[in-house]
Amino acid sequence: MNYRQYLHPGGEPATRQRMPQLMTSWGLLYRALRRAFPPERYYEGSPLTEFSCGEFGVSVRFGAGDVQRFDLLVGADGARSFVRQQLLPEVKPRYAGYVAWRGVVPESEAGRALLRTFDDHFTFQQMHHSHILCYVIPGAAGERERGKRRLNWVWYWNVPESELFALMTGMRREIA
């Protein structure tokens, strides 16, 4: 990807500057790391219940009770990470002030005009209390050829914390 651009409200480019950068997808990164890792050392679906760091590595206990020793523990266990809670118990999640909706569209399902707008561009559009970004990522199976990739889009919307419950549930909380 060679350019960064900002769009006018009508969709036409407002500014464009050369800014080469590489984009990928979590799926492609995951598959590359997974291929490099031996299957017998990967514990998918085995809940981590305890770990301790020592001079010679990390001892890990899994849900079934088995204990293994590793040189490195990668805590890729999500937003409410057990690993992070154990290492940094004082760090608590806090609302960032916005919500985000994300989606992907196969290039093959996007119109030519849309593809011309986004191909080779990391694109932003600013709106009232929100913005959208869009860029091309590899296809579902890691394809990088034109026509087989996907358009990744994320819509960020600034929402006061007091309105978050109603937004996320469709319900309003009335406090008397």
Q: Where do the model's predicted regions map?
A:
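Conserved FAD/dinucleotide-binding core of flavoprotein oxidoreductases
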Residues: 12-13, 17-20, 25-30, 64-67, ...
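Conserved beta-strand-loop-beta-strand element in the redox core of flavoprotein oxidoreductases
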Residues: 50-68
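Short hydrophobic core segments
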Residues: 48, 68-79, 153
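Active-site-adjacent segment of FAD-dependent monooxygenases/related oxidoreductases
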Residues: 1-39, 43-52
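Glycine-rich loop(s) and the adjacent beta-strand/alpha-helix scaffold that form part
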Residues: 100-110
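Flavin (primarily FAD) binding-site architecture
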Residues: 75-89, 107, 164
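Glycine-rich beta-alpha-beta "Rossmann" dinucleotide-binding loop(s) and their flanking helix/strand
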Residues: 85-100
